[in-house]
Amino acid sequence: MSPIFDALVPMVVEQTSRGERSYDIYSRLLKERVIFLTGQVEDHMANLVVAQLLFLESENPDKDIFLYINSPGGSVTAGMSIYDTMQFIKPNVSTVCMGQACSMGAFLLAGGAPGKRYVLPNSRVMIHQPLGGFQGQASDIQIHAQEILTIKNKLNRLLAEHTGQPIEVIERDTDRDNFMSADQAVEYGLVDAVLKHRGE
């Protein structure tokens, strides 16, 4: 079960011609093509997000999907499964940061459809290089160290593509935790606009 469903989840009751039908709030919003990516990015959560993306594509391949992000980041491989699916499916995926989009959360935010990446005004965005820790034989540690450097270079290259920043700037700015306000995230190219009110 996803952590989002561990707490009490509100139910929405709809009147239909066949009587009443109740949905949990997230399932009801899924009908409106809204997906929530909240909390730590990990395999189970990523599988749920990927499944929802694929389902919404099958429902209507020409209508935008809205991915709301409030995440401190997490697993690179789990995040990349979401990212690759966002790029793979036919519908545009519009990303919206609410609260925070850090690390892999920021990467997914930037990976939304060009011109359709948004941030709410009091949200924070943070980019940095991937983290990892290893133990074991020296040769294995060396292999893992090389792998994390390969991942770092790949993430930097993709961030450069999505932001329009030179790769050298991305490498410098992700060397340490780099926090940005909503306006700074727009200026940097991680998102396209700050949304203060619906309809903007």
UniProtKB/Swiss-Prot annotation:
Q: Which gene specifies this protein's sequence?
A: clpP
One biological process term from GO is:
protein quality control for misfolded or incompletely synthesized proteins
Subcellular localization: Cytoplasm
The record's similarity note reads:
Belongs to the peptidase S14 family.
- Subunit-level organization: Fourteen ClpP subunits assemble into 2 heptameric rings which stack back to back to give a disk-like structure with a central cavity, resembling the structure of eukaryotic proteasomes.
This chain's function reads: Cleaves peptides in various proteins in a process that requires ATP hydrolysis. Has a chymotrypsin-like activity. Plays a major role in the degradation of misfolded proteins.
Q: Name one Pfam family in it.
A: CLP_protease
- Which GO CC annotations does the UniProt entry carry? cytoplasm; endopeptidase Clp complex
Tell me yes or no: is Protease among this UniProt entry's keywords. Answer: yes
* The organism's taxonomic lineage, starting at the top: Bacteria, Pseudomonadati, Pseudomonadota, Gammaproteobacteria, Vibrionales
**Listed GO molecular functions?**
ATP-dependent peptidase activity; ATPase binding; serine-type endopeptidase activity
Keywords (alphabetical) are:
Cytoplasm, Hydrolase, Protease, Serine protease
Q: Which residues form a coiled coil?
A: none
* Residues annotated as catalytic: S103 (nucleophile), H128
Give the main EC class: hydrolase
Kindly give the InterPro entries that the UniProt entry links to this protein: ClpP, ClpP/crotonase-like_dom_sf, ClpP/TepA, ClpP_His_AS, ClpP_Ser_AS
**HAMAP family registered for this protein in UniProt:** ClpP
Organism of this sequence: Vibrio cholerae serotype O1 (strain ATCC 39315 / El Tor Inaba N16961)
EC code: 3.4.21.92
CDD domains named in the record:
S14_ClpP_2
Spell out the protein name for this chain. Answer: ATP-dependent Clp protease proteolytic subunit
Q: Which SUPFAM superfamilies match?
A: ClpP/crotonase
Q: Which reaction does it catalyse?
A: Hydrolysis of proteins to small peptides in the presence of ATP and magnesium. alpha-casein is the usual test substrate. In the absence of ATP, only oligopeptides shorter than five residues are hydrolyzed (such as succinyl-Leu-Tyr-|-NHMec, and Leu-Tyr-Leu-|-Tyr-Trp, in which cleavage of the -Tyr-|-Leu- and -Tyr-|-Trp bonds also occurs)
Query: What PROSITE patterns does the entry give?
Result: CLP_PROTEASE_HIS, CLP_PROTEASE_SER
The source's superkingdom equals Bacteria
